Amino acid sequence: MCIRDSHTYRRMIAQMDEGIGWVLAALERHGVARDTLVVFTSDNGGERFSDNWPLVGGKMDLTEGGIRVPWIAHWPASIAAGGVSEQMCMTMDWSATMLEAGGASADPAYPLDGVSLLPVLRDPAHTFERPLYWRMNHRGQRALRRGPWKYLRVDGHDYLFDLSADERERANRAPREPARLDAMRVDWEAWNASMPPIPDDATVSLGYGAKNMPQR
């Protein structure tokens, strides 16, 4: 990142921080800060021009650099300060979490894909089994995370990684653990069969070309 870009990036971070401060100050001013759940998280992946070290990949990748994001939850009435959780989750879990936190439930006719994280918010040491699935047409990518293990397919090649020892996804364990690979592949395929198919014409653009630009 060049000096000019670094300066712009610092200004963007400062502006974001200031905006979050305004929101939190407004909650305090209205006397509802203690009983309000505030979640700060991110869009998936680093941009293609960024450095996501120590992770590999960025947007349009199902490697960890393309899908792993941070989140911070603030809710003084229910969350103790300073807690850190190892629980795996997805953004869709926040819908279920917010509903449970508010004493509501999803319409049975429209079940949620997410799982409530409320027990984790109240006790960061609490964890539960939470397999995570991904798929995308770009490069025929698919992924499944179960515990520390991750199954990944890119361009027709299957990989198996132990992220507890290899978060950069450099050591493919598939040749050494064929049974685990097969089980995770079958698991992913069963999940995929339960989902609507991805339209054949669902494509992505890795950058702006003339046809993507507004009319001039």
Regions found by a protein language model. Name each.
Residues 1-5:
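Conserved small/polar residues in nucleotide/adenosyl-binding loops
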Residues 7, 14-18, 89-96, 112-115, ...:
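A structural signal for well-ordered alpha-helical segments within the folded catalytic domains
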Residues 9, 13, 20, 37-42, ...:
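Beta-strand elements within well-structured catalytic alpha/beta cores of enzymes
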Residues 10-13, 17-24, 28, 95-99, ...:
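Non-transmembrane alpha-helical segments in soluble domains
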Residues 33, 50, 64-68, 89, ...:
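Short, solvent-exposed loop/turn segments at the edges of secondary structure
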Residues 34-36, 81-144:
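Polar, surface-exposed loop/tail segments
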Residues 94, 146-147, 155-157, 163-216:
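Long, internal low-complexity/basic segments
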